[in-house]
A protein has these predicted regions:
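PP2C/PPM-type serine/threonine phosphatase catalytic domain
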Residues: 1-117
């Protein structure tokens, strides 16, 4: 599979709140895009936390081993990680991120999504 990712700050924002990650492992493919909530504090931090949470899961499991439940737990854990970080840093209060991901193995794909993007 050939894949490419790129983010762009756009014409309105002062910071790029987009984060993305993609990898091929053991014949499987995983990709995730996270977009910090515009107008809130720390959108770029929130989206990077989502990506780091996904990378942590993939350090333990191949995309071919991920279940729907794993994807659900990943998104819930990412949310907890974002909220925990916001609780520890007043400047990040209210931060959040959307996330869209896909895990592909053979002819099976599992898609996860949270947010309004």
């Amino acid at each position: 599979m050939i894949y490419y990712s790129r983010t762009h700050i756009g014409l309105v924002r002062k910071t790029n709140e987009d984060s993305c990650f993609a990898t091929e492992v053991d014949g499987g493919f995983f990709a995730i895009v996270a977009d910090g909530m515009g107008g809130q504090n720390g959108g770029e931090v929130a989206s990077s936390i989502v990506i780091e949470t996904a990378k942590a899961l993939l350090s333990e499991k191949s995309p071919c081993c991920l279940s729907q439940n794993d994807i659900r737990r990943l998104l819930i854990q990412a949310n907890h990680n974002v909220l925990d970080r916001a609780d520890r840093d007043r400047e990040l209060k209210g931060m959040g991120s959307t996330a869209t991901l896909v895990s592909i193995c053979g002819m099976q794909a599992i898609i996860g999504h949270v947010g309004d993007s």
